[in-house]
Amino acid sequence: MKPPIRPQVTLRSLKRTPNPTPVVCHVRQRHHESKILQEIKDEDNAFILSILQASPSARDSRSYLSSFAPPQPADIATATPAATPSDGAQPPAQNPLVNALLNPILRRPALVKIQGPFTDAQLESICRGMAHLQKLGLVSVIVVDRDDLPSTESSDRYEAQRQRAIVRHEVERVVHFLSRHRAAARPVFSTVARIADPELEPEEAQKGVFVEEEGLDHVRRAVGEGEIPVLLPVALDSGCRSRRIPANRVLLALASAMSTHTSSPVDLTPRRLLVINREGGIPSYARQGLPHLYINLASEFSYINRTFQPQWNDSHPTALSNLFLANGCLAHMPREASALIVSHRSPAALIANLITNKPAHSASLPHALLVESEGRITRDTPTLIRKGLPVRVLRSMEEVDQDKLTHLLETSFKRTLDREGFYNRLKNDLDFVIVIGDYAGAAVCTLEGKPVSDSFAYPPNHPEPICYLDKFAVHPSHQGDGTVDFLWVALRDETYGLGQLDASNPSIGSLRGVGRGRDLVWRSRSDNPVNKWYYERSSGFLKTRDEKWKVFWCDAEQRLGEIWREREFGGGRLVRVVEKEEKGRVKWWEEVIGAIPSAWSA
Protein backbone atom coordinates (compact mmCIF):
# COMPACT_ATOMS: atom_id res chain seq x y z
CA MET A 1 0.00 0.00 0.00
CA LYS A 2 1.40 3.36 -1.00
CA PRO A 3 1.71 6.04 1.66
CA PRO A 4 -0.74 8.90 1.30
CA ILE A 5 0.48 11.84 -0.70
CA ARG A 6 0.82 14.97 1.51
CA PRO A 7 -0.59 18.08 -0.16
CA GLN A 8 1.95 20.76 -1.11
CA VAL A 9 1.33 24.08 0.56
CA THR A 10 1.75 27.07 -1.75
CA LEU A 11 0.73 30.71 -1.54
CA ARG A 12 -1.99 30.03 -4.12
CA SER A 13 -3.39 27.08 -2.15
CA LEU A 14 -3.28 29.11 1.06
CA LYS A 15 -5.49 31.73 -0.56
CA ARG A 16 -8.02 29.03 -1.52
CA THR A 17 -7.90 27.26 1.87
CA PRO A 18 -10.57 28.39 4.37
CA ASN A 19 -8.22 27.90 7.37
CA PRO A 20 -4.66 28.31 6.09
CA THR A 21 -1.71 26.87 8.04
CA PRO A 22 -0.17 29.69 10.18
CA VAL A 23 3.30 29.43 8.68
CA VAL A 24 4.08 33.12 9.21
CA CYS A 25 3.05 32.91 12.88
CA HIS A 26 5.48 30.05 13.48
CA VAL A 27 8.24 32.06 11.82
CA ARG A 28 7.46 35.09 13.98
CA GLN A 29 7.39 32.94 17.12
CA ARG A 30 10.74 31.38 16.28
CA HIS A 31 12.16 34.84 15.60
CA HIS A 32 10.82 36.10 18.94
CA GLU A 33 12.27 33.11 20.82
CA SER A 34 15.59 33.56 19.04
CA LYS A 35 15.64 37.23 20.04
CA ILE A 36 14.96 36.36 23.69
CA LEU A 37 17.71 33.72 23.69
CA GLN A 38 20.14 36.23 22.19
CA GLU A 39 19.24 38.80 24.87
CA ILE A 40 19.84 36.19 27.58
CA LYS A 41 23.17 35.25 26.02
CA ASP A 42 24.23 38.92 25.75
CA GLU A 43 23.30 39.55 29.37
CA ASP A 44 25.20 36.47 30.56
CA ASN A 45 28.24 37.62 28.59
CA ALA A 46 27.98 41.09 30.13
CA PHE A 47 27.72 39.50 33.58
CA ILE A 48 30.87 37.42 33.08
CA LEU A 49 32.70 40.41 31.59
CA SER A 50 31.83 42.54 34.63
CA ILE A 51 33.39 39.87 36.87
CA LEU A 52 36.56 39.80 34.79
CA GLN A 53 36.80 43.61 34.81
CA ALA A 54 36.80 43.56 38.62
CA SER A 55 40.28 41.92 38.42
CA PRO A 56 40.21 40.33 41.88
CA SER A 57 43.53 39.46 43.50
CA ALA A 58 44.17 36.15 45.25
CA ARG A 59 43.38 37.80 48.60
CA ASP A 60 40.18 39.32 47.18
CA SER A 61 39.14 35.89 45.92
CA ARG A 62 39.74 34.27 49.31
CA SER A 63 37.75 37.01 51.02
CA TYR A 64 34.84 36.60 48.61
CA LEU A 65 34.91 32.81 48.98
CA SER A 66 34.84 33.04 52.76
CA SER A 67 31.57 35.00 52.61
CA PHE A 68 29.76 33.75 49.51
CA ALA A 69 31.15 30.36 48.50
CA PRO A 70 28.92 27.31 48.93
CA PRO A 71 29.93 25.08 51.85
CA GLN A 72 32.26 22.27 50.89
CA PRO A 73 30.85 18.76 51.47
CA ALA A 74 32.79 16.97 54.20
CA ASP A 75 32.68 13.60 52.50
CA ILE A 76 34.39 14.53 49.23
CA ALA A 77 36.95 11.84 48.52
CA THR A 78 40.45 13.15 48.33
CA ALA A 79 41.96 10.13 46.69
CA THR A 80 42.11 10.01 42.90
CA PRO A 81 40.64 6.77 41.50
CA ALA A 82 42.99 4.56 39.57
CA ALA A 83 42.81 4.92 35.80
CA THR A 84 41.27 2.10 33.79
CA PRO A 85 41.70 1.30 30.12
CA SER A 86 38.26 2.79 29.41
CA ASP A 87 39.11 6.04 31.17
CA GLY A 88 39.66 8.98 28.90
CA ALA A 89 41.35 12.24 29.76
CA GLN A 90 40.84 13.36 33.33
CA PRO A 91 38.34 16.24 33.71
CA PRO A 92 39.95 19.59 34.50
CA ALA A 93 40.15 20.60 38.14
CA GLN A 94 37.28 22.83 39.23
CA ASN A 95 38.02 26.39 40.26
CA PRO A 96 36.26 27.19 43.56
CA LEU A 97 36.09 30.93 42.79
CA VAL A 98 34.39 30.32 39.43
CA ASN A 99 31.97 27.84 41.04
CA ALA A 100 31.14 30.30 43.81
CA LEU A 101 30.60 33.18 41.38
CA LEU A 102 28.39 31.30 38.94
CA ASN A 103 26.61 28.91 41.34
CA PRO A 104 26.17 30.71 44.67
CA ILE A 105 24.20 28.93 47.39
CA LEU A 106 24.58 31.29 50.33
CA ARG A 107 22.44 34.40 50.09
CA ARG A 108 23.81 37.46 51.85
CA PRO A 109 21.67 40.59 52.19
CA ALA A 110 22.67 44.11 51.21
CA LEU A 111 20.82 47.31 52.03
CA VAL A 112 20.26 49.41 48.91
CA LYS A 113 18.88 52.91 48.46
CA ILE A 114 17.86 53.75 44.89
CA GLN A 115 17.88 57.54 45.08
CA GLY A 116 15.99 58.76 42.02
CA PRO A 117 14.31 60.08 40.03
CA PHE A 118 15.74 58.05 37.15
CA THR A 119 14.71 57.63 33.54
CA ASP A 120 13.68 54.19 32.33
CA ALA A 121 17.10 53.64 30.72
CA GLN A 122 18.91 54.67 33.91
CA LEU A 123 16.72 52.54 36.16
CA GLU A 124 17.10 49.54 33.86
CA SER A 125 20.89 49.88 34.09
CA ILE A 126 20.67 49.99 37.89
CA CYS A 127 18.38 46.96 38.03
CA ARG A 128 20.73 45.04 35.72
CA GLY A 129 23.43 45.62 38.34
CA MET A 130 21.11 44.41 41.11
CA ALA A 131 20.34 41.28 39.07
CA HIS A 132 24.07 40.60 38.63
CA LEU A 133 24.61 40.98 42.37
CA GLN A 134 21.83 38.47 43.00
CA LYS A 135 23.57 35.96 40.74
CA LEU A 136 26.69 36.42 42.87
CA GLY A 137 24.79 35.64 46.07
CA LEU A 138 24.01 39.17 47.30
CA VAL A 139 20.27 39.75 47.71
CA SER A 140 19.45 43.45 47.72
CA VAL A 141 16.90 44.82 50.19
CA ILE A 142 15.87 47.95 48.30
CA VAL A 143 14.27 51.12 49.64
CA VAL A 144 13.24 53.59 46.93
CA ASP A 145 13.80 57.32 47.32
CA ARG A 146 13.01 60.41 45.27
CA ASP A 147 15.07 63.60 45.50
CA ASP A 148 12.30 65.59 43.80
CA LEU A 149 9.86 64.98 46.68
CA PRO A 150 9.96 66.54 50.16
CA SER A 151 11.65 64.21 52.65
CA THR A 152 8.50 64.01 54.80
CA GLU A 153 4.84 63.66 53.99
CA SER A 154 2.81 66.75 53.18
CA SER A 155 0.17 67.89 55.67
CA ASP A 156 -2.19 68.38 52.73
CA ARG A 157 -4.15 65.17 52.33
CA TYR A 158 -4.37 65.23 48.54
CA GLU A 159 -0.71 66.20 48.08
CA ALA A 160 0.29 63.40 50.46
CA GLN A 161 -1.71 60.91 48.38
CA ARG A 162 -0.06 62.18 45.19
CA GLN A 163 3.42 61.77 46.69
CA ARG A 164 2.53 58.29 47.98
CA ALA A 165 1.37 57.31 44.49
CA ILE A 166 4.69 58.46 43.02
CA VAL A 167 6.83 56.34 45.35
CA ARG A 168 4.46 53.39 44.95
CA HIS A 169 4.87 53.65 41.18
CA GLU A 170 8.64 53.82 41.72
CA VAL A 171 8.51 50.47 43.54
CA GLU A 172 6.55 48.97 40.65
CA ARG A 173 9.08 50.30 38.12
CA VAL A 174 12.00 48.77 40.04
CA VAL A 175 10.25 45.39 40.27
CA HIS A 176 9.42 45.54 36.55
CA PHE A 177 13.01 46.18 35.47
CA LEU A 178 14.39 43.58 37.87
CA SER A 179 12.03 41.01 36.36
CA ARG A 180 13.17 41.97 32.86
CA HIS A 181 16.67 40.92 33.89
CA ARG A 182 15.49 37.59 35.33
CA ALA A 183 15.85 38.69 38.95
CA ALA A 184 13.02 37.51 41.18
CA ALA A 185 11.67 40.59 42.98
CA ARG A 186 8.86 41.21 45.43
CA PRO A 187 7.15 44.58 45.99
CA VAL A 188 6.51 45.12 49.70
CA PHE A 189 3.67 47.60 50.10
CA SER A 190 3.14 46.63 53.73
CA THR A 191 4.66 48.89 56.37
CA VAL A 192 7.73 47.26 57.92
CA ALA A 193 8.87 50.19 60.11
CA ARG A 194 7.24 52.00 63.00
CA ILE A 195 7.61 55.49 64.45
CA ALA A 196 8.30 55.16 68.17
CA ASP A 197 5.96 56.80 70.68
CA PRO A 198 8.07 58.15 73.59
CA GLU A 199 5.26 57.48 76.09
CA LEU A 200 4.32 53.97 74.97
CA GLU A 201 7.75 52.75 73.78
CA PRO A 202 10.45 54.55 75.82
CA GLU A 203 13.11 51.98 74.89
CA GLU A 204 12.61 52.61 71.17
CA ALA A 205 12.14 56.38 71.47
CA GLN A 206 15.83 57.12 70.99
CA LYS A 207 15.81 55.35 67.62
CA GLY A 208 12.80 57.32 66.42
CA VAL A 209 12.03 54.67 63.79
CA PHE A 210 12.40 50.93 64.40
CA VAL A 211 11.48 47.61 62.78
CA GLU A 212 9.64 44.95 64.78
CA GLU A 213 9.94 41.22 64.20
CA GLU A 214 6.59 41.16 62.41
CA GLY A 215 7.72 43.80 59.94
CA LEU A 216 11.04 42.04 59.43
CA ASP A 217 9.23 38.86 58.38
CA HIS A 218 8.44 40.46 55.00
CA VAL A 219 12.16 40.90 54.37
CA ARG A 220 13.14 37.53 55.84
CA ARG A 221 10.73 35.58 53.63
CA ALA A 222 11.89 37.34 50.48
CA VAL A 223 15.61 36.89 51.22
CA GLY A 224 15.09 33.27 52.25
CA GLU A 225 13.46 32.57 48.89
CA GLY A 226 16.13 34.45 46.94
CA GLU A 227 13.80 37.31 46.01
CA ILE A 228 14.66 41.00 46.11
CA PRO A 229 12.24 42.90 48.38
CA VAL A 230 11.50 46.45 47.22
CA LEU A 231 10.17 48.65 50.02
CA LEU A 232 8.36 51.96 50.34
CA PRO A 233 9.89 54.65 52.60
CA VAL A 234 6.94 54.54 55.00
CA ALA A 235 6.33 53.81 58.69
CA LEU A 236 3.36 53.37 61.03
CA ASP A 237 2.83 56.14 63.56
CA SER A 238 1.36 55.70 67.05
CA GLY A 239 -2.15 55.98 65.59
CA CYS A 240 -1.45 53.08 63.18
CA ARG A 241 -1.45 55.44 60.21
CA SER A 242 1.07 54.82 57.46
CA ARG A 243 3.24 57.89 56.84
CA ARG A 244 5.98 58.59 54.31
CA ILE A 245 9.31 59.27 56.03
CA PRO A 246 12.91 59.80 54.80
CA ALA A 247 14.31 56.64 53.22
CA ASN A 248 17.45 57.00 55.35
CA ARG A 249 15.43 56.47 58.54
CA VAL A 250 13.96 53.25 57.15
CA LEU A 251 17.41 52.01 56.15
CA LEU A 252 18.88 52.80 59.58
CA ALA A 253 16.04 50.92 61.25
CA LEU A 254 16.52 47.96 58.91
CA ALA A 255 20.29 47.90 59.57
CA SER A 256 19.66 47.70 63.30
CA ALA A 257 16.92 45.06 63.10
CA MET A 258 18.60 42.87 60.46
CA SER A 259 21.87 42.78 62.44
CA THR A 260 20.16 41.49 65.58
CA HIS A 261 20.83 37.80 66.09
CA THR A 262 17.70 35.64 66.16
CA SER A 263 16.90 31.94 66.08
CA SER A 264 15.80 32.21 62.43
CA PRO A 265 17.79 30.04 60.00
CA VAL A 266 17.95 33.00 57.58
CA ASP A 267 20.90 35.26 58.42
CA LEU A 268 19.77 38.80 57.61
CA THR A 269 22.97 40.58 58.70
CA PRO A 270 23.74 43.05 55.87
CA ARG A 271 27.17 42.79 54.22
CA ARG A 272 26.94 45.96 52.15
CA LEU A 273 25.18 49.30 52.04
CA LEU A 274 24.75 50.63 48.49
CA VAL A 275 23.52 54.14 47.76
CA ILE A 276 22.86 54.63 44.04
CA ASN A 277 22.28 58.27 43.18
CA ARG A 278 22.72 60.90 40.46
CA GLU A 279 25.43 63.00 42.13
CA GLY A 280 28.19 60.41 42.63
CA GLY A 281 30.57 60.00 45.56
CA ILE A 282 31.21 62.33 48.48
CA PRO A 283 33.28 65.38 47.40
CA SER A 284 36.72 65.84 48.95
CA TYR A 285 38.17 69.13 50.14
CA ALA A 286 41.67 67.80 49.37
CA ARG A 287 40.72 66.81 45.79
CA GLN A 288 39.09 70.15 44.89
CA GLY A 289 35.61 68.64 44.85
CA LEU A 290 36.39 65.30 43.20
CA PRO A 291 35.12 62.35 45.25
CA HIS A 292 36.78 60.71 48.20
CA LEU A 293 38.00 57.27 47.16
CA TYR A 294 38.11 55.71 50.60
CA ILE A 295 36.77 57.02 53.91
CA ASN A 296 37.91 55.82 57.32
CA LEU A 297 34.91 56.83 59.44
CA ALA A 298 36.72 56.38 62.75
CA SER A 299 39.30 58.97 61.72
CA GLU A 300 37.65 61.20 59.10
CA PHE A 301 33.92 61.49 59.83
CA SER A 302 34.04 64.78 61.76
CA TYR A 303 36.73 66.25 59.52
CA ILE A 304 34.71 65.67 56.32
CA ASN A 305 31.72 67.41 57.89
CA ARG A 306 33.84 70.40 58.93
CA THR A 307 35.49 70.84 55.53
CA PHE A 308 32.33 70.40 53.42
CA GLN A 309 32.19 73.44 51.11
CA PRO A 310 29.00 75.56 50.76
CA GLN A 311 28.94 75.20 46.95
CA TRP A 312 28.65 71.43 47.30
CA ASN A 313 25.17 71.84 48.79
CA ASP A 314 24.08 72.54 45.20
CA SER A 315 26.19 69.94 43.36
CA HIS A 316 25.99 67.21 46.05
CA PRO A 317 22.90 68.06 48.13
CA THR A 318 22.63 64.64 49.80
CA ALA A 319 26.34 63.87 50.31
CA LEU A 320 26.41 64.59 54.05
CA SER A 321 23.10 62.84 54.74
CA ASN A 322 24.43 59.76 52.92
CA LEU A 323 27.64 59.96 54.98
CA PHE A 324 25.52 60.00 58.16
CA LEU A 325 23.53 57.07 56.77
CA ALA A 326 26.72 55.06 56.17
CA ASN A 327 28.03 55.90 59.63
CA GLY A 328 24.79 54.78 61.28
CA CYS A 329 24.32 51.58 59.27
CA LEU A 330 27.94 50.41 59.50
CA ALA A 331 27.78 50.78 63.29
CA HIS A 332 25.41 47.77 63.28
CA MET A 333 27.12 45.76 60.52
CA PRO A 334 30.16 43.42 60.71
CA ARG A 335 33.69 44.88 60.67
CA GLU A 336 34.33 43.70 57.11
CA ALA A 337 31.14 45.38 55.82
CA SER A 338 31.36 48.51 53.69
CA ALA A 339 29.19 51.23 52.19
CA LEU A 340 29.40 52.38 48.58
CA ILE A 341 28.10 55.76 47.39
CA VAL A 342 27.93 55.42 43.61
CA SER A 343 26.48 57.23 40.62
CA HIS A 344 24.06 55.39 38.34
CA ARG A 345 26.65 56.05 35.61
CA SER A 346 29.10 53.59 37.26
CA PRO A 347 27.15 50.29 37.34
CA ALA A 348 30.32 48.16 37.03
CA ALA A 349 31.42 49.47 40.44
CA LEU A 350 28.70 47.36 42.09
CA ILE A 351 30.23 44.08 40.91
CA ALA A 352 33.79 45.22 41.63
CA ASN A 353 32.86 46.28 45.15
CA LEU A 354 31.17 42.97 45.92
CA ILE A 355 34.09 40.82 44.75
CA THR A 356 37.03 42.97 45.90
CA ASN A 357 35.46 45.18 48.63
CA LYS A 358 37.94 47.86 47.54
CA PRO A 359 37.65 51.36 46.05
CA ALA A 360 37.91 51.98 42.32
CA HIS A 361 41.51 53.21 42.83
CA SER A 362 43.82 52.74 45.78
CA ALA A 363 43.75 55.90 47.89
CA SER A 364 47.47 55.48 48.64
CA LEU A 365 48.54 55.89 45.00
CA PRO A 366 50.30 59.16 44.06
CA HIS A 367 47.82 62.02 43.67
CA ALA A 368 49.11 62.93 40.19
CA LEU A 369 48.53 59.36 39.03
CA LEU A 370 44.95 59.46 40.29
CA VAL A 371 43.99 62.72 38.58
CA GLU A 372 46.01 62.60 35.35
CA SER A 373 46.35 58.96 34.25
CA GLU A 374 44.00 56.88 32.13
CA GLY A 375 41.01 55.78 34.19
CA ARG A 376 41.48 58.80 36.47
CA ILE A 377 39.09 60.03 39.12
CA THR A 378 35.95 61.72 37.82
CA ARG A 379 32.84 63.08 39.47
CA ASP A 380 31.23 59.66 38.96
CA THR A 381 33.99 57.75 40.77
CA PRO A 382 32.34 55.96 43.72
CA THR A 383 33.24 56.50 47.37
CA LEU A 384 33.89 53.42 49.51
CA ILE A 385 33.27 53.84 53.24
CA ARG A 386 34.37 51.62 56.13
CA LYS A 387 34.10 51.81 59.89
CA GLY A 388 37.87 51.95 59.90
CA LEU A 389 40.12 52.53 62.89
CA PRO A 390 41.50 55.66 64.58
CA VAL A 391 44.95 56.84 63.47
CA ARG A 392 47.54 58.22 65.92
CA VAL A 393 50.99 59.70 65.37
CA LEU A 394 53.36 59.05 68.31
CA ARG A 395 56.52 61.14 68.56
CA SER A 396 58.25 59.69 71.62
CA MET A 397 59.07 56.19 72.84
CA GLU A 398 57.12 56.87 76.05
CA GLU A 399 53.91 56.83 73.99
CA VAL A 400 54.73 53.53 72.25
CA ASP A 401 53.42 50.24 73.68
CA GLN A 402 56.49 48.10 73.03
CA ASP A 403 54.75 44.80 73.75
CA LYS A 404 51.95 45.48 71.26
CA LEU A 405 54.33 46.81 68.62
CA THR A 406 56.58 43.76 69.06
CA HIS A 407 53.62 41.41 68.67
CA LEU A 408 52.50 43.23 65.51
CA LEU A 409 55.97 43.14 63.91
CA GLU A 410 56.64 39.49 64.77
CA THR A 411 53.18 38.40 63.58
CA SER A 412 53.42 40.36 60.33
CA PHE A 413 57.02 39.45 59.40
CA LYS A 414 56.94 35.97 61.01
CA ARG A 415 60.34 36.60 62.58
CA THR A 416 61.64 37.17 66.11
CA LEU A 417 62.48 40.77 66.97
CA ASP A 418 65.74 41.70 68.68
CA ARG A 419 63.84 43.81 71.19
CA GLU A 420 66.79 45.27 73.07
CA GLY A 421 68.74 46.31 69.99
CA PHE A 422 65.69 47.58 68.10
CA TYR A 423 64.22 49.73 70.88
CA ASN A 424 67.60 51.07 71.99
CA ARG A 425 68.10 52.35 68.44
CA LEU A 426 64.62 53.90 68.40
CA LYS A 427 65.34 55.78 71.64
CA ASN A 428 68.13 57.61 69.82
CA ASP A 429 66.81 57.84 66.25
CA LEU A 430 62.99 57.80 66.42
CA ASP A 431 61.17 60.32 64.23
CA PHE A 432 57.60 59.09 64.74
CA VAL A 433 55.39 55.98 64.85
CA ILE A 434 51.98 55.91 63.16
CA VAL A 435 49.59 53.46 64.83
CA ILE A 436 46.21 52.37 63.47
CA GLY A 437 43.66 51.15 65.99
CA ASP A 438 45.05 48.98 68.78
CA TYR A 439 48.23 48.24 66.81
CA ALA A 440 46.39 46.72 63.86
CA GLY A 441 49.05 48.44 61.75
CA ALA A 442 52.09 50.62 62.31
CA ALA A 443 54.71 52.60 60.41
CA VAL A 444 58.00 53.30 62.22
CA CYS A 445 60.13 56.16 60.86
CA THR A 446 63.61 57.09 62.07
CA LEU A 447 66.08 59.87 61.33
CA GLU A 448 69.25 58.38 59.86
CA GLY A 449 72.58 60.01 59.04
CA LYS A 450 72.42 62.48 61.90
CA PRO A 451 75.67 64.32 62.79
CA VAL A 452 77.94 62.13 64.92
CA SER A 453 80.65 64.79 65.40
CA ASP A 454 81.35 68.45 64.75
CA SER A 455 83.30 67.52 61.62
CA PHE A 456 80.27 65.78 60.06
CA ALA A 457 79.10 67.32 56.78
CA TYR A 458 75.91 66.55 54.86
CA PRO A 459 76.10 65.97 51.11
CA PRO A 460 75.48 69.09 49.00
CA ASN A 461 71.80 69.97 48.47
CA HIS A 462 70.68 67.48 51.13
CA PRO A 463 71.27 69.31 54.43
CA GLU A 464 69.12 67.16 56.72
CA PRO A 465 68.91 63.63 58.12
CA ILE A 466 67.21 60.91 56.08
CA CYS A 467 63.56 60.21 56.92
CA TYR A 468 63.78 56.42 56.86
CA LEU A 469 60.79 54.07 56.90
CA ASP A 470 62.19 51.41 59.20
CA LYS A 471 59.11 49.21 59.59
CA PHE A 472 55.74 49.13 57.84
CA ALA A 473 53.42 46.38 59.08
CA VAL A 474 49.73 45.44 59.05
CA HIS A 475 48.40 42.57 61.15
CA PRO A 476 47.32 39.59 58.97
CA SER A 477 43.75 39.84 60.30
CA HIS A 478 43.52 43.37 58.86
CA GLN A 479 45.14 42.73 55.50
CA GLY A 480 42.64 43.43 52.73
CA ASP A 481 40.29 45.56 54.84
CA GLY A 482 41.73 48.95 53.87
CA THR A 483 44.08 49.32 56.85
CA VAL A 484 47.18 49.32 54.62
CA ASP A 485 45.83 52.21 52.52
CA PHE A 486 44.81 54.23 55.58
CA LEU A 487 48.28 53.68 57.07
CA TRP A 488 50.17 54.68 53.91
CA VAL A 489 48.07 57.82 53.42
CA ALA A 490 48.85 58.89 57.00
CA LEU A 491 52.55 58.16 56.36
CA ARG A 492 52.54 60.24 53.19
CA ASP A 493 50.85 63.16 54.97
CA GLU A 494 53.61 63.24 57.62
CA THR A 495 56.54 62.97 55.19
CA TYR A 496 56.71 63.50 51.43
CA GLY A 497 53.18 64.95 51.15
CA LEU A 498 53.60 67.43 53.99
CA GLY A 499 52.84 71.02 52.99
CA GLN A 500 50.23 70.00 50.42
CA LEU A 501 46.54 70.84 50.76
CA ASP A 502 45.49 67.19 50.83
CA ALA A 503 47.94 66.40 53.67
CA SER A 504 45.73 68.25 56.14
CA ASN A 505 44.40 65.14 57.85
CA PRO A 506 42.62 64.80 61.20
CA SER A 507 44.85 62.07 62.70
CA ILE A 508 45.64 62.44 66.40
CA GLY A 509 49.12 63.94 66.81
CA SER A 510 49.60 64.67 63.09
CA LEU A 511 51.14 67.87 61.73
CA ARG A 512 47.80 68.67 59.97
CA GLY A 513 49.63 69.47 56.74
CA VAL A 514 51.71 72.26 58.26
CA GLY A 515 55.44 72.05 57.48
CA ARG A 516 57.79 71.28 54.63
CA GLY A 517 57.74 67.91 52.89
CA ARG A 518 60.66 65.49 53.23
CA ASP A 519 61.88 62.69 50.99
CA LEU A 520 60.90 59.29 52.38
CA VAL A 521 63.41 56.44 51.93
CA TRP A 522 63.18 52.72 52.69
CA ARG A 523 64.66 49.42 51.62
CA SER A 524 63.20 46.03 50.84
CA ARG A 525 64.72 42.67 49.99
CA SER A 526 64.99 42.15 46.23
CA ASP A 527 62.75 39.07 46.34
CA ASN A 528 60.05 40.65 48.53
CA PRO A 529 56.65 40.07 46.84
CA VAL A 530 55.45 43.39 48.28
CA ASN A 531 57.88 45.25 45.99
CA LYS A 532 55.22 45.45 43.26
CA TRP A 533 53.09 47.48 45.66
CA TYR A 534 56.09 49.70 46.45
CA TYR A 535 56.84 50.30 42.74
CA GLU A 536 53.39 51.86 42.30
CA ARG A 537 53.84 54.28 45.20
CA SER A 538 57.52 55.27 45.01
CA SER A 539 59.22 57.92 42.89
CA GLY A 540 62.13 55.60 42.11
CA PHE A 541 64.30 52.72 43.30
CA LEU A 542 67.71 51.15 42.76
CA LYS A 543 69.40 47.86 43.58
CA THR A 544 72.23 47.85 46.08
CA ARG A 545 75.65 46.75 44.89
CA ASP A 546 75.25 43.28 46.39
CA GLU A 547 71.75 43.10 44.77
CA LYS A 548 70.22 41.83 48.01
CA TRP A 549 68.19 44.99 48.56
CA LYS A 550 66.19 47.57 46.69
CA VAL A 551 66.26 51.14 47.96
CA PHE A 552 62.98 53.00 47.31
CA TRP A 553 62.21 56.67 47.76
CA CYS A 554 59.31 59.11 47.47
CA ASP A 555 60.32 62.66 46.53
CA ALA A 556 58.86 65.49 48.58
CA GLU A 557 55.86 66.66 46.55
CA GLN A 558 56.26 70.27 47.63
CA ARG A 559 59.84 70.40 46.30
CA LEU A 560 58.82 68.66 43.06
CA GLY A 561 56.08 71.23 42.59
CA GLU A 562 58.57 74.07 42.95
CA ILE A 563 60.92 72.46 40.41
CA TRP A 564 58.02 71.92 38.03
CA ARG A 565 56.97 75.57 38.23
CA GLU A 566 60.54 76.69 37.54
CA ARG A 567 60.68 74.45 34.46
CA GLU A 568 57.23 75.55 33.29
CA PHE A 569 58.14 79.24 33.29
CA GLY A 570 61.77 78.77 32.33
CA GLY A 571 61.65 76.93 29.01
CA GLY A 572 59.26 74.07 29.68
CA ARG A 573 61.79 71.24 30.18
CA LEU A 574 60.29 68.19 31.83
CA VAL A 575 61.37 67.28 35.35
CA ARG A 576 63.90 64.43 35.30
CA VAL A 577 63.73 61.42 37.61
CA VAL A 578 66.99 62.67 39.17
CA GLU A 579 67.62 66.40 38.83
CA LYS A 580 71.13 67.88 38.79
CA GLU A 581 70.82 69.16 42.33
CA GLU A 582 69.70 65.71 43.49
CA LYS A 583 72.73 63.81 42.25
CA GLY A 584 74.74 62.15 44.99
CA ARG A 585 71.84 61.76 47.40
CA VAL A 586 70.96 58.21 46.34
CA LYS A 587 74.54 57.05 46.87
CA TRP A 588 74.51 58.62 50.31
CA TRP A 589 71.18 56.97 51.11
CA GLU A 590 72.57 53.59 50.16
CA GLU A 591 75.63 54.05 52.36
CA VAL A 592 73.72 55.23 55.42
CA ILE A 593 70.88 52.73 55.14
CA GLY A 594 73.28 49.87 54.45
CA ALA A 595 74.90 50.48 57.83
CA ILE A 596 71.62 50.07 59.77
CA PRO A 597 71.77 46.83 61.81
CA SER A 598 69.09 44.16 61.40
CA ALA A 599 66.15 44.38 63.79
CA TRP A 600 65.73 40.61 63.88
CA SER A 601 67.33 37.95 66.03
CA ALA A 602 69.61 35.59 64.13
UniProtKB/Swiss-Prot annotation:
Family of this protein: Belongs to the acetyltransferase family.
Domain of life: Eukaryota
EC number: 2.3.1.1
Record function comment: N-acetylglutamate synthase involved in arginine biosynthesis.
Reactions catalysed according to its record: L-glutamate + acetyl-CoA = N-acetyl-L-glutamate + CoA + H(+)
Keyword NADP attributed: no
Transit peptide residues according to the UniProt entry: 1-71
Region Disordered: start-end pairs: 1-21, 62-93
Subcellular location, principal: mitochondrion
EC main group: transferase
The N-acetyltransferase domain, residue ranges: 389-577
Name under which the protein is recorded: Amino-acid acetyltransferase, mitochondrial
GO cellular component, one term: mitochondrial matrix
Record localization: Mitochondrion
A GO term, aspect molecular function: L-glutamate N-acetyltransferase activity
Pathway given in the UniProt record: Amino-acid biosynthesis; L-arginine biosynthesis; N(2)-acetyl-L-ornithine from L-glutamate: step 1/4
Gene name of this polypeptide: ARG2
Annotated GO biological process: L-arginine biosynthetic process; ornithine biosynthetic process
Keyword match Plastid: no
Low complexity bias: start-end ranges: 74-85
Source species: Cryptococcus neoformans var. neoformans serotype D (strain JEC21 / ATCC MYA-565)
This protein's UniProt keywords: Acyltransferase, Amino-acid biosynthesis, Mitochondrion, Transferase, Transit peptide
